[in-house]
């Protein structure tokens, strides 16, 4: 036994300390209160709330501020966080869903929640997916052939099928066009751009968010204006942000709290815009927009590189990142929260450039061009990934951006750090198990037995171990298992 353990330890030691570049983040998406991130080795990591299993890590009971890897696959390409659900695309073009399946939002057709990623159908040509995110249970996706597909709730015609109120539990093609380029969803409306540069919209239009000059809702895609130079569009809540090829920003819909970014004072504020209106106060080219129902973040720069970030709106739980936020408690009111009707800048370090900006419910995440992650705002579910203890999370906020380290744990698929079904997981200090495991032992890499238990149910802390790499051996369902763990 000891000899085999020593041999395995030697092999693991070699693989662990193989020369490799420092791990860094390449993509990230803020859901309602759950964060999905991809590391440069293609592994998927999550943190935040897990009430519907949306982390893809069943061992997390409710929430966590520690990034955990979802399985050991190293071919994740794209992530999209929603309202207690997430969508994921792999390099092979397969689409996966995790979390709640309310209204058929996962597109899996089985009507059940999934606590680990579940493949959506068998197609291998998915290119992009978006969702209603914080407000409901609808998703739309574009395939590599340019066709548009949707599923989930269609309560406000946000799917664009024309079948008002008819939910779809599996992907259904929207029309027959095959030249869709990008698509984005608000609370109940959808905006999209075709490869010919035309802008389209459908669904709810009660705030003028479609930008067609009316407040009349539509059931299927309609072209917005006649321009053919649109390059980017973002739908957020009841408002829309569209960018032309020259980087100019046009906005429409609800302008509560100045969320359209027009830099109007509270006294000057116009509540709604029914047509796309130029945001002439932006002197830099706008690259992307993100936000929630009461906050908007704008990314500006050149050639896809973000050089500056602006925020506007409500500053609950530090959402604006300017240092002036306030904690929302059970006894306080949203009316007491500070807000800015004009653009402010989060207190990010000077001189940095960014590749990704994503905002969730009162929190934001920005990845620098060299893969570092800065985060600010609400952290009550651990969605910022800062390793805050669970007991401290109910009051955890960051009024200004903080650097969130990327986990450096080596993920080796040949010796699982997590069983494929997520039965057993180690978060750096505690072993979690969804089923009882027996004959549990922890060995040093030299083969010395350091800790032992006959049976472990749910949790087993190893705080007495020094920081380092160890071997965990245990029996599950009569079968022996070995996994590498890293004590933080």
Q: Can you name each region flagged by the protein language model?
A:
Residues 92-95, 143-148, 170-176, 194-199, ...:
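Thr-biased low-complexity repeat/linker tracts and other Thr-enriched repetitive architectures
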Residues 1-22:
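Sec-dependent, cleavable N-terminal signal peptides
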């Amino acid at each position: 036994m000891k000899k085999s353990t020593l041999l395995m330890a030697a092999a693991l030691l070699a693989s662990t300390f193989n020369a490799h570049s420092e791990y860094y983040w390449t993509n990230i998406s803020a859901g309602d209160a759950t964060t999905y991130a991809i590391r440069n080795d293609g592994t998927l990591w999550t943190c935040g709330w897990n009430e519907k299993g949306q982390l893809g890590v069943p061992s997390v009971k409710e929430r966590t501020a520690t990034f955990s890897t979802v399985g050991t696959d190293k071919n994740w390409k794209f992530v999209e966080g929603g309202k207690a659900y997430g969508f994921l695309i792999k390099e092979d073009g397969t689409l996966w869903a995790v979390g709640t399946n309310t209204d058929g939002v996962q597109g899996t057709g089985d009507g059940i929640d999934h606590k680990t990623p579940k493949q959506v159908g068998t197609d291998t040509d998915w290119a992009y997916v978006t969702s209603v995110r914080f407000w409901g249970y609808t998703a739309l996706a574009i395939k590599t052939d340019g066709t548009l597909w949707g599923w989930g709730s269609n309560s406000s015609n946000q799917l664009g099928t024309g079948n008002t109120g008819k939910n779809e539990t599996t992907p259904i093609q929207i029309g027959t066009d095959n030249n869709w380029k990008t698509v984005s969803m608000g609370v109940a409306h959808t905006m999209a751009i075709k490869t010919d540069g035309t802008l389209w919209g459908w669904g709810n239009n009660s705030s003028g968010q479609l930008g067609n000059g009316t407040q009349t809702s539509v059931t299927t895609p309609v072209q917005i204006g006649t321009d053919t130079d649109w390059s980017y569009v973002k739908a957020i809540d009841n408002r829309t942000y569209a960018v032309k090829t020259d980087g100019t920003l046009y906005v429409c819909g609800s302008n509560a709290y100045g969320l359209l970014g027009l830099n109007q004072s509270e006294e000057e504020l116009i509540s709604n815009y029914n047509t796309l209106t130029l945001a002439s106060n932006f002197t830099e080219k706008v690259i992307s927009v993100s936000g929630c129902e009461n906050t908007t973040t704008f990314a500006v720069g050149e050639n896809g590189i973000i050089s500056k970030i602006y925020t506007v709106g409500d500053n609950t739980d530090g959402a604006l990142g300017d240092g002036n936020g306030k904690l929302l408690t059970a006894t306080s009111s949203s009316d007491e929260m500070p807000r800015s009707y004009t653009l402010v800048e989060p207190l990010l370090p000077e001189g940095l450039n960014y590749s990704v900006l994503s905002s969730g419910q009162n929190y934001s995440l920005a990845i620098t061009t060299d893969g570092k992650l800065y985060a600010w705002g609400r952290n009550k579910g651990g969605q910022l990934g800062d390793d805050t203890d669970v007991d401290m999370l109910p009051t955890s906020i960051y009024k200004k951006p903080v650097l969130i380290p990327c986990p450096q744990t080596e993920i080796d698929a040949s010796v699982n750090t997590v069983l494929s079904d997520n039965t057993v997981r180690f978060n750096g200090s505690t072993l979690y198990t969804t089923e009882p495991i027996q004959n549990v032992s922890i060995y040093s890499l030299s083969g010395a037995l350091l800790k032992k238990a006959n049976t472990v149910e749910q949790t087993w802390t190893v705080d007495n171990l020094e920081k380092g790499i160890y071997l965990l051996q245990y029996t599950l369902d009569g079968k022996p298992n070995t996994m590498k763990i890293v004590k933080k």
